[in-house]
């Protein structure tokens, strides 16, 4: 017998969410009581737009560093294949508002002050597709997302 598997993100009605937003997908408790939280960091409206691969790749590398300087406990922040945002996995519990503030502050740094020298992992030794980066695209998308504001609610706009 095969186990029935439900993937939450495929159950989400992508036609009713209002990006940009941060949404707590769920929490899991490990055998020793540790809590892991999974967040939907949706930066662009699903099925209306997507971030080009090179820009998204650069945002990914920058968020890997910038989020960790702003909050403890980040395990991973990986882009969705649809290129509309990221899954972020964290140790512990954090409100969507707290995570949204961290993302907003990180995107602000990308848009305003980041230089090519600030982007980690852009060499052949440190990245599996090191030629596929665009700081210009990352900065432009960060500005567009910040102009719209980041909500801590996926279904009602509550910009932080």
From Swiss-Prot:
<keyword id="KW-0408">Iron</keyword>
<keyword id="KW-0479">Metal-binding</keyword>
<comment type="function">
    <text>Involved in the synthesis of autoinducer 2 (AI-2) which is secreted by bacteria and is used to communicate both the cell density and the metabolic potential of the environment. The regulation of gene expression in response to changes in cell density is called quorum sensing. Catalyzes the transformation of S-ribosylhomocysteine (RHC) to homocysteine (HC) and 4,5-dihydroxy-2,3-pentadione (DPD).</text>
</comment>
<keyword id="KW-0071">Autoinducer synthesis</keyword>
<dbReference type="InterPro" id="IPR037005">
    <property type="entry name" value="LuxS_sf"/>
</dbReference>
<comment type="similarity">
    <text>Belongs to the LuxS family.</text>
</comment>
<feature type="binding site">
    <location>
        <position position="127"/>
    </location>
    <ligand>
        <name>Fe cation</name>
    </ligand>
</feature>
<feature type="binding site">
    <location>
        <position position="57"/>
    </location>
    <ligand>
        <name>Fe cation</name>
    </ligand>
</feature>
<comment type="subunit">
    <text>Homodimer.</text>
</comment>
<protein>
    <recommendedName>
        <fullName>S-ribosylhomocysteine lyase</fullName>
        <ecNumber>4.4.1.21</ecNumber>
    </recommendedName>
</protein>
<dbReference type="InterPro" id="IPR003815">
    <property type="entry name" value="S-ribosylhomocysteinase"/>
</dbReference>
<feature type="binding site">
    <location>
        <position position="61"/>
    </location>
    <ligand>
        <name>Fe cation</name>
    </ligand>
</feature>
<dbReference type="GO" id="GO:0043768">
    <property type="term" value="F:S-ribosylhomocysteine lyase activity"/>
</dbReference>
<keyword id="KW-0456">Lyase</keyword>
<dbReference type="InterPro" id="IPR011249">
    <property type="entry name" value="Metalloenz_LuxS/M16"/>
</dbReference>
<keyword id="KW-0673">Quorum sensing</keyword>
<dbReference type="GO" id="GO:0005506">
    <property type="term" value="F:iron ion binding"/>
</dbReference>
<dbReference type="GO" id="GO:0009372">
    <property type="term" value="P:quorum sensing"/>
</dbReference>
<dbReference type="Pfam" id="PF02664">
    <property type="entry name" value="LuxS"/>
</dbReference>
């Amino acid at each position: 017998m095969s186990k029935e598997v439900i993937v939450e993100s495929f159950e989400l009605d992508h036609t009713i969410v209002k990006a940009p937003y941060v949404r707590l997908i769920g929490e899991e408790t490990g055998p020793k009581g540790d809590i892991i939280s999974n967040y939907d960091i949706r930066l662009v409206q699903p099925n209306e737009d997507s971030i080009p691969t090179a820009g998204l790749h650069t945002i990914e590398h920058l968020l890997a560093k910038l989020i960790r300087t702003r909050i403890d406990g980040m395990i991973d922040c990986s882009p969705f294949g649809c290129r509309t945002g990221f899954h972020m996995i964290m140790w512990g519990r954090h409100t969507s508002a707290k995570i949204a503030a961290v993302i907003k502050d990180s995107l602000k740094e990308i848009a305003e002050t980041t230089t090519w020298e600030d982007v980690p992992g852009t060499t052949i030794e440190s990245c599996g597709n090191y030629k596929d980066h665009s700081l210009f695209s990352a900065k432009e998308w960060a500005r567009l997302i910040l102009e719209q504001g980041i909500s801590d609610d996926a279904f009602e706009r509550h910009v932080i």
